[in-house]
Amino acid sequence: HEEAGALWRALAEGEGEGVVSGLSLVELLRLGLKGALAKEDAELLLQAIPAVCRVVWPDWTTGERAARLSHGLYLPLVDALVLATALEAGARELWTTDADLGRYEGKLRVVLLR
């Protein structure tokens, strides 16, 4: 995705702030372990992402918000936790390959990567 590549380069150069849910990193690890993502690619991403993005783990407040989002938008809980983490962190955009998150309409823009 061209726009995602440009955003990544900007973050790597210190322009703006990226935020990533710790759960997204765990998901990358899982994908690497099960072979859905090449192990080397997963390892590279797991090193690179925290180097340029602030890693945020959900707390109870985020969990409560996620439960409501999951219920209201019919999202799987992990997806709702990622969304709630972005909202609690004050993110303006959420970049994702998860089409389910496209159902969210609100304070942040969901960018679906295809």
Where are these regions (language model features)?
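Short, well-structured N-terminal submotif of metal-dependent ribonuclease cores
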Residues: 1-20, 32-47, 99, 112-114
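Short strand-turn motif at the edge of the Rossmann-like AdoMet-binding core
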Residues: 23
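Active-site neighborhoods of divalent-metal-dependent phosphate/nucleic-acid chemistry enzymes
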Residues: 54-97
